[in-house]
């Protein structure tokens, strides 16, 4: 769920989840146009990951994970929860790897400015 995702973001980036709400064209919803930078592309890929889970509820299904030696370990009994956790883990890692591309001008970015054909997942 968004709760676990938020915790992962804090643990891996030391940024608050609010830093990514309405960031660019894909972080925190919107999902249109082209990603603005590598950080926004992380969210695009995350959205694509969620698209592969049509029978799951990634925003509301809570799951369990461990934080061990600076690493996220997904531990769930159900397939849906494990896959949601893996999607969230991947975006948190991606955001950490692309912290240098984070640009404040894309925070609370107007969705109307997100134009162009979206990339394919």
UniProtKB/Swiss-Prot annotation:
Record's protein name: Phospholipase A2 homolog ECO_00035
Keywords: Disulfide bond, Myotoxin, Secreted, Toxin
PROSITE patterns, per database record: PA2_ASP, PA2_HIS
Self-association state and partner proteins as the record states: Monomer.
Function: Snake venom phospholipase A2 homolog that lacks enzymatic activity. Shows high myotoxin activities and displays edema-inducing activities. Has cytotoxic activities against HUVEC cells (LC(50)=4.9 uL) and human lung adenocarcinoma A549 cells (LC(50)=3.5 uL).
Disulfide bonds: 25-114, 27-43, 42-94, 48-121, 49-87, 56-80, 74-85
The keyword Protease is annotated on this UniProt entry: no
Main subcellular localisation: secreted
A single BP term in Gene Ontology: negative regulation of T cell proliferation
């Amino acid at each position: 769920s968004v709760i676990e995702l938020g915790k992962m973001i804090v643990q891996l980036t030391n940024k608050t989840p609010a830093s990514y709400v309405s960031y660019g064209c894909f972080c925190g919803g919107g999902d249109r146009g082209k990603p603005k930078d590598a950080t926004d592309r992380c969210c695009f890929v995350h959205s694509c990951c969620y698209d592969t889970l049509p029978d799951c509820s990634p925003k509301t299904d809570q799951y369990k994970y461990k934080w061990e030696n600076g690493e996220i370990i997904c531990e769930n009994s159900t397939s849906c929860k494990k896959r949601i956790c893996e999607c969230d883990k991947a975006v948190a890692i991606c955001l950490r790897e692309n912290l240098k591309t984070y640009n404040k001008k894309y925070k609370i970015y107007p969705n109307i400015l997100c134009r162009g054909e979206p990339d394919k997942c």
